[in-house]
Regions:
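Conserved donor-binding/catalytic core segment of Leloir-type glycosyltransferases
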Residues: 9, 187-203, 209-212, 227-228
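Carbohydrate-associated surface elements
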Residues: 146, 166
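A short helix/loop element that forms part of the nucleotide-sugar donor recognition site in Leloir-type
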Residues: 173-186
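Nucleotide-activated donor-binding/catalytic signature segment of Leloir-type glycosyltransferases, i.e.
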Residues: 237-273
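Aromatic "clamp/platform" in nucleotide-sugar-dependent glycosyltransferases that forms part
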Residues: 286
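Short hydrophobic beta-strand element within catalytic cores of glycosyltransferases
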Residues: 294, 303-306, 321-324
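A charged, aromatic-enriched C-terminal amphipathic alpha-helix characteristic of glycosyltransferases
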Residues: 343, 347, 357-389
Length: 394
């Protein structure tokens, strides 16, 4: 008699090219070999995923403003009655599902579902109300020890497991830079500073372009020193084209496509070319629970310049050029109140110039970054196995 296949209800961005969506794609590709998968796809508006067979995908939003499908979650939970319910989202969204989990457990005391929250903690000062809101989960898992510590400081008393993100090194890998640039119509002698991030307040793209403009002006750098931004020119952040024109660097700007959106990006193969076109990756993010584009860039051998805060120093293990931040907090908006950190402008300019003027330093850091990201701990298959071991042990 064949063993009964357990059911998993997976709740997260799927199948979309967001950061959460990348994580979902990689985890689901392994989970589906072991579970009967039911997926509530956030930012998904079809009836099923046409690319990955054997999955039952429900759009999260019912068109009623509930974009995370919290109400639909409760309905599908009662319908599917999974063995494992895996939720990938921020802790304050996890709290919303947590209320439904509590209700489900009260109504169904005989249910054996294990509820798991895999959550990014990208900053200090996690509100106690958020921590209390995730108490109905049976397992809480963070990406880093930084995240684990912040939840504990917020008052979480239960056990917290730590499982990192991964990177698909069969896709994100070094290529010949000159050939890539020829294919992308980028000058082979250009010096490219790359930023891949969503155009949203936490990423501080206003500072990215300002610091770049200060750097090229202070050092009177030639026109072939350019900044490459991959992301939406207009989203929930700034009007990028107006800002770069104000700064006078519009002629130095490279973009992937003027019509990109948060849910419509490039293929992974095209993204690998984007990373390989760069001389250095630079982000001004004010808080980070992981930073998938950073990991992807590093796996192609591109050195990274990063602000020295939150989870970044931990998982990169020093394999980056770190820039100090200002010694004052900047609280996140929408009442979240997590502490964001602002990168030091003068120190960032110095770091950009150091990497520009030192080709050997770039090569060495790029080599070390590649070695770090190709370690087994960042392999998605190994990461999925770690999760399933946690599910098994209860």
């Amino acid at each position: 008699m064949s063993r009964k296949v357990q059911k998993m209800l997976y709740v997260g961005d799927f199948p979309v090219p967001t950061g959460f969506g990348v994580v979902s794609k990689n985890l689901v590709s392994h989970f589906k070999k072991h579970y009967d998968m039911h997926i509530i796809g956030i930012n998904y508006y079809g009836d099923y995923d046409p690319e990955i067979e054997g999955l039952k995908v429900y759009p999260a939003s019912a068109g009623n403003g509930d974009v995370f499908g919290v109400d639909k979650f409760f309905q599908i939970l009662q319908q599917v009655r999974p063995d494992v319910c895996f939720i990938l989202n921020d802790v304050w969204i996890g709290m919303e599902y947590g209320a439904k989990i509590k209700e489900f457990k009260t109504d169904n005391p005989e249910a054996k579902t294990m509820f798991v929250l895999y959550t990014p903690i990208d900053a200090e000062n996690i509100k106690p109300m958020f921590v209390e809101g995730i108490s109905p989960y049976d397992k809480v898992i963070t990406y880093t020890n930084f995240g684990k510590t912040q939840l504990e400081l917020g008052g979480y008393k239960g056990k917290i497991d730590v499982v990192p993100h991964g990177v698909d090194t069969s896709v994100f890998k070094p290529m010949d830079k000159k050939e890539v640039r020829k294919a992308m119509n980028i000058g082979v002698d250009d010096y490219i500073v790359l930023n891949v991030s969503r155009n949203q307040p936490r990423k501080k793209l206003d500072l990215f372009f300002f610091i770049f403009s200060e750097w090229v002006k202070r050092y009177n750098l030639p026109p072939n020193v350019r900044c490459y931004y991959h992301g939406a020119l207009r989203d929930v952040g700034i009007d990028i084209m107006q800002w770069v024109e104000y700064l006078g660097i519009q002629d130095r700007l490279v973009i992937s496509n003027p019509n990109l959106t948060a849910n419509r990006g490039l293929s992974e193969q095209s993204m690998n070319m984007v990373y390989n076109s760069a001389d250095v990756f630079f982000t001004t993010t004010a808080a980070e629970g992981w930073g998938l584009p950073i990991a992807e860039a590093m796996s192609t051998g591109v050195p990274a310049i990063l602000p020295n805060h939150s989870a970044l120093p931990e998982w990169t293990a020093g394999n980056a050029q770190f820039v100090p931040v200002y010694p004052f907090p900047s609280l996140a908006d929408r009442g979240l109140n997590t502490i964001h950190h602002i990168i030091n402008v003068d120190e960032a300019v110095k770091s950009l110039q150091f990497m520009y003027a030192n080709e050997e330093a770039r090569k060495n850091l790029g080599r070390d970054s590649y070695k770090h990201m190709t370690r087994g701990e960042f392999n998605w298959k190994n990461i999925a196995s770690r999760f399933m071991e946690i599910f098994k042990n209860g």
